[in-house]
Amino acid sequence: MRKDGPACRRRSLCGPTFLLIVSVCAGTSAEGLPPLPAQVMSASPLPPLPAELSPVIPLPPLPGSAAPQPTTSFDVGTTIPQPWLFGNGDEPLDGIRPRVLRRPIGPRTAPEPVPTPITFPTRWRTPVDPPIGYTGKSSVMPVETQQDPHFVPVEDRWRTGYSAWDRYDKGHPRNDDYPFLPGRRFDPFNQNVIKGDFPIIGQHTFLDVTASYLSFQEFRQVPTATTPFESTARPNEQNFFQRPNQFFSTNFFSIAFDLTHGDAAFKPADWRLRLVPTFNFNNLSVQELGVVSPNVLQGTSRTRNFWALQEAFFETKITDTSSDYDFTSIRVGTQPFISDFRGFLFADINRAVRIFGTRNANRDQYNLAYFRQWEKDTNSQLNTFNDRRQNLFFFNYYRQDFLVPGYTAQVSVTYNNDPRSFKFDNNRFLVRPDPVGIARPHEIDVAYLGWAGDGHIGRYNLTHQFYWALGRDSLNPLANQTQTINAQMFAIEGSYDRDWARFRASFFWSSGDRNASNTHATGFDSILDAPNFAGGGFSYWNRQQIPLFGVNLVQRLSLVPNLRSSKFQGQSNFVNPGLILPNLGADFDLTPKVKMFNNINFLWFESTNALETFLFQGRIARHIGTDLSTGFEYRPLLSENVAITMGASTLIPGQGFRDIYNNQNSRVGALFGGFLAINLLF
């Protein structure tokens, strides 16, 4: 069959047409396009185009010369006629290109620029929960940026957030226990930046601000001498010892600022600054003249106030001595210090330089301190800025788990240099020297060698203390001559815990002077004690200051009957009767909020020779009496923020006490004391 229709002709022309276009492209001399190889260019010229192609591909007229341009072959050197279709290479080919290959008609206009949107680096954030407690503002500036969603830099590691936790799935009712809750600025019960729980500068500097108020109200009965030959509070009074009733009130307001640099746990502080300004307001009301002041015109009541910078010291670490956080630090300024476990010898806040530290992974501790005592205010016992010129040196060393686990042993050496001085207190009573015998200024140099222990052996608790005092008194007022001091003291307490009860038995002994007329002073006396022993402040004998002819038979918050004018402003007196005190006690945790303390003390003088010499009395019995006391401590919030302490005590006089305080026609009766102390902390 013959296939010569129009379609067939079109198909038969496709090959030459394609060859023609390829030839035109290959033979052009446009810049950058190399000519075809000579084998191709030397081929036979193309045959004439059929007539039917003219309307399909119209050819533009050739500009310039119509003669074809010869083309030289690269390898043969023969010339062939250049097809007229190629022209001279300068003419546009849009006329022969298909429509899809032609250039746009007219000049192309540049599109208007599209503004580039402002972009910020993408940050991946995780949900941020508030930190627990009141953290305040952070002073840590961020220095890192987040680079990927797997790591969120948190420069302030103290203020990490915690999610709210409904521990018991109760739907968060009021007044329930929920951890990880945000706090408030003045919330003392949860974590707070002003309590030192979060740093205020950087990540290692903390500020702890503690405001405290202590209100102490006391009713007491003590033997009170009057002045029957000068003036009395009531007419027709003839007895020497009159109405014993007294009421004492004292109130302390203080704010403690404690700035510490270091870590919050384990590692000791690098440095520390502490300031505690304190204000006191006190009042004493009695029923006899000559008590609040030797001037009877001052009446029977006295009100005083006083403020002091009670604590002010700077502490810094000298060195780290081991990888177990052992250290050596130094503290300079007015600071608290207790010489032993129970405060038998010295417990005070005063001006000092103290070096202290630990050894053997905190198993050993040591103190080396020098105190230069400030003078005390008479009625508040706060520090003044007057130099007393008394020098004290302390060295003690503690060893934990000594012999048995849970038992700590201590050895100590203490030196007291109290030079000559003459002092009237703020109430115009003579306190140095003691107004007994030959009241002349004298100097005391005495050293105390101590051995103590505190802890438990199995289920039995044990505390003991021994002191040996050796030294010299240049002129004892009572003995009226130089004294060589050689006196001792011993105390021991054992207790047993049974569930919520503790049963105690203790014994205290201080040597007495058996001959006040010789040159050997053998009655033990402390420096400035505050013993927590045999009932402590709940006991009548311990708490009350029992006056006796210008001095005191026993000092306030002391056990030793030292015939001293004042524990806080007087000098030690080693010519005294001494004391024997056995004790039985029982403490009960009635509830988690209420504790009960019960004690019974039996009191004897170790020797009465010093009393007989002082009172010009023939014979005084040794039995002082029986001291009964009970007390309660109530903490309604189960913390120290609110603590209420109350106690009641009585002294049933023995024959020795009656020999001293009986009137000519009457006997001294039982003496009572009761107190209420409210301590508020924030």
Features from the language model and the residues they span:
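Bacterial N-terminal signal peptides
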Residues: G15-C25
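Surface-exposed loop and membrane-interface regions of Gram-negative outer-membrane beta-barrel proteins
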Residues: S231-N251, H261-F327, I338, V436, ...
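Structural signature of outer-membrane beta-barrel channels/translocons
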Residues: G202, L214, D258-A264, E315-T319, ...
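Outer-membrane beta-barrel "beta-signal"
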Residues: T630, V668-F682
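Signature for the C-terminal beta-barrel architecture of outer-membrane proteins
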Residues: D324-D326, Q335-A521, I580-P582, D589-P592, ...
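Membrane-embedded beta-strand positions of outer-membrane beta-barrel proteins
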Residues: V209-Y213, L273-P277, I330-V332, Y366-L368, ...
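C-terminal structural cap/anchor segments
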Residues: R514-H623
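N-terminal periplasmic/intermembrane-space "pro-region" immediately following the signal or transit peptide
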Residues: G27-D270, V276, D499, F503, ...
